[in-house]
């Protein structure tokens, strides 16, 4: 039996008791209460050993892929689950029946207000890839959500006043994305190890807000990222059951949409829904992370080298297969199949370019709607009307009733052949430019970064990094010059791009491009392949206090 106590628990961060966003009086002390900390410590002590074992399993699988011992296929041990037509996911929960347009963004206070005021049906509040996990971003994200759910998020800055346009019960449904299983929160140690960031984010939000959310006619809803095996989903389901039992909430009140954004998960979609069926609200196509994962898992195999990033689209064979399998699987099991992100942001000073960008969004959403998706993501409120217009053609709140007649094989999911594929010097430069810009902003505490009129998150930088690693490893020949991609070439272009970006930075000497390049260099020259950029850079952005807080005074 796990002991519910704060013994051997150390918090290396100040518990701020000063309100930061008048007129709200909410402070960090209202989030990091003794009861809330005991709750997340209980979850950590109960489930962290399982989490660590599942992460070790990921490493073991990668070793087998690298050696050629394992090739992806559907799991023989779960064939019975796939072949049983009788089981279904949960019926759509209150506030999650119509999900035709979902906006996403980090839990910054101004972004929360803007997203909740947008003409969308749901809002995915993101502690993961569009957030840089500084202590301030993570803990004040909890403060901001606490206030939003209680209609007390309105605030003023010297330049602008932010106000919700209506009662929270009539605004877009909140869905929170915690950090992935691979991340930890190093400001809170339990039994001499950092707490799982997933449990930290989920636990604080759930403990403080679950009952309030039910009161307003919604519920505690989540997006679950980066999972690579159905047993990782089972772990979430076990946590949900314990969490609901702990606060006296009926099981099944929580709902979770799982992002299918890793290659292993694409072979386990049915098992993933099955493991969380009591709490399932569907699956989502996490397109950029899926490309990243495909390269990451198959990086040692020359037949799976992908071309310039702009040539890898949702109509590429392996992407098209994964989308069609996802929609078919979700609708057969009675849950939502959500489309991917439109990352475009308005181009205010160029009407012609803006029109072209918006047409690209419209065509992308039309493709998704026709394929059978029940809704899709946008990164900016200006894109919401386009998404709404397209998905209004469903004629219903969703199209779960429509089960596309498709048969997707394991070979289809691994078909990375792309017509007219090429790698060019410009492709190298684009990857380095985007990767450096994103990493530099992330190191300064911003995880949601406008680059070339697109709102980028960590997945974009991950694609940049792993493509360059793959091109160097396999000595890809450049279409424009006939030269091989070598460590020397990528290092040379990296230095050029770093100097160019640093000299143009409005921050002057305070920019972090040199630091970003230091971490980027061994990755893009093929020397090392880190699991995630976010874990690689994490220690650069945290500032734990030297001494822990005295928790006995809470």
Curated annotation (Swiss-Prot):
<dbReference type="GO" id="GO:0004474">
    <property type="term" value="F:malate synthase activity"/>
</dbReference>
<dbReference type="Pfam" id="PF01274">
    <property type="entry name" value="MS_TIM-barrel"/>
</dbReference>
<protein>
    <recommendedName>
        <fullName>Malate synthase 2</fullName>
        <ecNumber>2.3.3.9</ecNumber>
    </recommendedName>
</protein>
<dbReference type="Pfam" id="PF20656">
    <property type="entry name" value="MS_N"/>
</dbReference>
<keyword id="KW-0329">Glyoxylate bypass</keyword>
<feature type="active site" description="Proton acceptor">
    <location>
        <position position="177"/>
    </location>
</feature>
<keyword id="KW-0576">Peroxisome</keyword>
<dbReference type="InterPro" id="IPR046363">
    <property type="entry name" value="MS_N_TIM-barrel_dom"/>
</dbReference>
<dbReference type="InterPro" id="IPR011076">
    <property type="entry name" value="Malate_synth_sf"/>
</dbReference>
<dbReference type="InterPro" id="IPR044856">
    <property type="entry name" value="Malate_synth_C_sf"/>
</dbReference>
<feature type="short sequence motif" description="SKL peroxisome targeting motif">
    <location>
        <begin position="552"/>
        <end position="554"/>
    </location>
</feature>
<dbReference type="GO" id="GO:0006099">
    <property type="term" value="P:tricarboxylic acid cycle"/>
</dbReference>
<feature type="active site" description="Proton donor">
    <location>
        <position position="457"/>
    </location>
</feature>
<comment type="subunit">
    <text>Interacts with PEX9.</text>
</comment>
<dbReference type="GO" id="GO:0006144">
    <property type="term" value="P:purine nucleobase metabolic process"/>
</dbReference>
<dbReference type="InterPro" id="IPR006252">
    <property type="entry name" value="Malate_synthA"/>
</dbReference>
<dbReference type="Pfam" id="PF20659">
    <property type="entry name" value="MS_C"/>
</dbReference>
<comment type="similarity">
    <text>Belongs to the malate synthase family.</text>
</comment>
<dbReference type="InterPro" id="IPR001465">
    <property type="entry name" value="Malate_synthase_TIM"/>
</dbReference>
<dbReference type="InterPro" id="IPR048356">
    <property type="entry name" value="MS_N"/>
</dbReference>
<dbReference type="GO" id="GO:0005777">
    <property type="term" value="C:peroxisome"/>
</dbReference>
<dbReference type="InterPro" id="IPR019830">
    <property type="entry name" value="Malate_synthase_CS"/>
</dbReference>
<keyword id="KW-0659">Purine metabolism</keyword>
<dbReference type="GO" id="GO:0005782">
    <property type="term" value="C:peroxisomal matrix"/>
</dbReference>
<keyword id="KW-0816">Tricarboxylic acid cycle</keyword>
<comment type="function">
    <text>Allantoin metabolism-specific malate synthase involved in the recycling the glyoxylate generated during allantoin degradation by the ureidoglycollate (UG) hydrolase reaction.</text>
</comment>
<dbReference type="InterPro" id="IPR048355">
    <property type="entry name" value="MS_C"/>
</dbReference>
<keyword id="KW-0808">Transferase</keyword>
<dbReference type="GO" id="GO:0005829">
    <property type="term" value="C:cytosol"/>
</dbReference>
<dbReference type="GO" id="GO:0000256">
    <property type="term" value="P:allantoin catabolic process"/>
</dbReference>
<dbReference type="GO" id="GO:0006097">
    <property type="term" value="P:glyoxylate cycle"/>
</dbReference>
<dbReference type="GO" id="GO:0005737">
    <property type="term" value="C:cytoplasm"/>
</dbReference>
């Amino acid at each position: 039996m796990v002991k519910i106590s704060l013994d051997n628990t150390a918090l290396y961060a100040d518990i701020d008791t000063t309100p930061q966003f008048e007129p709200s009086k909410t402070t960090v002390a209202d989030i990091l209460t003794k009861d809330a900390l005991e709750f997340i410590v209980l979850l950590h002590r109960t489930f962290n050993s399982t989490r660590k074992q599942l992460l070790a399993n990921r490493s073991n699988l990668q070793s087998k892929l690298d050696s050629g011992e394992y090739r992806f296929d559907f799991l023989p041990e779960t064939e019975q689950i796939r072949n049983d037509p009788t089981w279904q996911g949960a019926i759509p929960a209150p506030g999650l029946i119509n999900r035709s347009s979902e906006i996403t963004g980090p839990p910054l206070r101004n972004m929360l207000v803007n997203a909740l005021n947008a003409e969308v049906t749901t809002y995915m509040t993101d502690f993961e890839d569009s957030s840089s996990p500084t202590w301030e971003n993570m803990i004040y994200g909890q403060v901001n959500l606490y206030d939003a759910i209680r209609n007390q998020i309105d605030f003023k800055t010297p330049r602008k006043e932010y106000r919700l346009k209506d009662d929270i019960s009539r605004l877009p449904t909140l869905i929170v994305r915690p950090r992935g299983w691979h991340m930890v929160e190093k400001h809170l140690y339990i039994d001499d190890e950092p707490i799982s960031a997933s449990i930290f984010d989920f636990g604080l939000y759930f403990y403080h807000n679950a009952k309030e959310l039910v009161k307003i006619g919604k519920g505690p809803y989540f997006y679950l990222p980066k999972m690579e095996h159905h047993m990782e989903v089972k772990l979430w389901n076990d946590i949900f059951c314990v969490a609901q039992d702990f606060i006296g909430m009926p099981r099944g009140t929580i709902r979770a949409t799982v992002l299918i954004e890793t290659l292993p998960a694409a072979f386990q979609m049915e098992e993933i829904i099955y493991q969380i069926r009591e709490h399932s609200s569907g699956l989502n196509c996490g397109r950029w992370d899926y490309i990243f994962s495909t390269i990451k898992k198959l990086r040692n195999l020359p037949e799976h080298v992908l071309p310039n990033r702009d040539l890898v689209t949702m109509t590429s064979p392996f992407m098209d297969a994964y989308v069609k399998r996802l929609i078919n699987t979700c609708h057969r099991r009675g849950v939502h199949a959500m489309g991917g992100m439109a990352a475009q942001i308005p181009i205010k000073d160029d009407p012609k370019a803006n029109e072209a960008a918006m047409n690209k969004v419209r065509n992308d959403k039309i493709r998704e709607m026709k394929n059978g998706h029940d809704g899709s993501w946008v990164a900016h409120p200006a894109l919401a009307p386009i998404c709404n217009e397209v998905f209004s053609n469903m004629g219903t709140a969703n199209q779960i009733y429509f089960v596309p007649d498709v048969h997707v094989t394991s070979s289809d999911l691994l078909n990375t052949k792309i017509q007219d594929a090429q790698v060019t010097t410009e492709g190298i430069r684009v990857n380095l430019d985007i990767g450096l810009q994103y990493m530099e902003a992330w190191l300064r505490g911003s995880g949601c970064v406008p680059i070339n009129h697109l709102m980028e998150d960590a997945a974009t930088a991950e694609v940049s990094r792993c493509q360059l690693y793959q091109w160097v490893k396999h000595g890809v020949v450049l279409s424009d010059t006939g030269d091989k991609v070598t460590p020397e070439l990528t290092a040379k272009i990296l230095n050029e791009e770093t100097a160019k970006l640093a000299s143009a930075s409005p921050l002057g000497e305070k920019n972090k491009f040199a630091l970003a390049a230091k971490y980027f260099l061994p990755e893009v020259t093929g020397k090392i392949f880190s699991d995630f950029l976010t874990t690689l850079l994490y220690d650069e952005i945290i500032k734990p206090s030297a001494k822990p807080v005295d928790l006995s005074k809470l």
